[in-house]
């Protein structure tokens, strides 16, 4: 399965 990146990205 294709994993979608988180958007907006969460800062560390």
From Swiss-Prot:
It is found in: Secreted. Keywords: Methylation, Secreted, Toxin. The keyword Secreted applies. It comes from the Eukaryota. Expressed by the venom gland. The modification N6-methyllysine is found at residue 2. GO terms for cellular component: extracellular region. One of its GO terms (molecular function) is toxin activity. Disulfide bonds: none annotated. The keyword rRNA-binding does not apply. Occurs in two forms. In form 1384.7 Da venom vasodilator peptide Lys-2 is methylated. In form 1370.6 Da venom vasodilator peptide Lys-2 is not methylated. Toxin. Induces vasodilation in mice and rabbits. This is 1370.6 Da venom vasodilator peptide. It comes from Bothrops moojeni (Lance-headed viper). The lineage of its organism: Eukaryota, Metazoa, Chordata, Craniata, Vertebrata.
């Amino acid at each position: 399965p294709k994993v979608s990146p988180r958007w907006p990205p969460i800062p560390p």
